[in-house]
Amino acid sequence: MITVTPLQLLGQDDRGSNFSWLTDRTGEFLLCYRHAGSSSGQHYHTGASANKNPEVMYLLNGQATLHWCTLNDITIHTVIATAPARIEVPANIWHQLIAVTDCTFIELNTVEDVRNDSIRIWKEDLEKTLMAR
């Protein structure tokens, strides 16, 4: 199951607002900008990369719809994330992010983590597999 957790609002005034989050991950991360209507993901991670087990991202602005399915499930589930929010995707969960609006997020992993631990399955192929079960 994908978990979406709103970030904690620390304070807000006429200048804007402040939020906090806690992470034990350090090093190189990905800053991603997505246009409304675009699709990302359509894959799952085996957990071979520590930074993909689980995959953690922070949605900084915008709204996204996440489609997800366990590898032995027969249903694709949907959850909506509205910034600011923390999104956690466990290993062996197929997932796809659709940007509802233009959005920005930080992935707490590197491109190398993605290359080493992403199994691509296009949504239409996943749906055919689920229908055959």
Predicted segments with their positions:
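A short, N-terminal "cap"/entry segment at the start of jelly-roll beta-barrel domains
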Residues: 1-31
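Conserved short histidine dyad/triad with adjacent acidic residue
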Residues: 11, 31-52
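Short beta-strand His + acidic residue motifs that chelate non-heme Fe in jelly-roll/DSBH
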Residues: 18, 66-67, 87-89, 95-100, ...
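Short histidine-centered beta-strand/loop micro-motifs
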Residues: 19-22, 41-51, 68, 77-79, ...
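Short, surface-exposed beta-strand-loop junctions and turns on beta-sheet-rich folds
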Residues: 48, 72-74, 112-113
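Glycine- and acidic-residue-biased ligand/ion/polar-headgroup-sensing regions
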Residues: 52-69
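Short acidic-glycine-tyrosine-enriched beta hairpin
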Residues: 70-91
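Double-stranded beta-helix
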Residues: 96-133
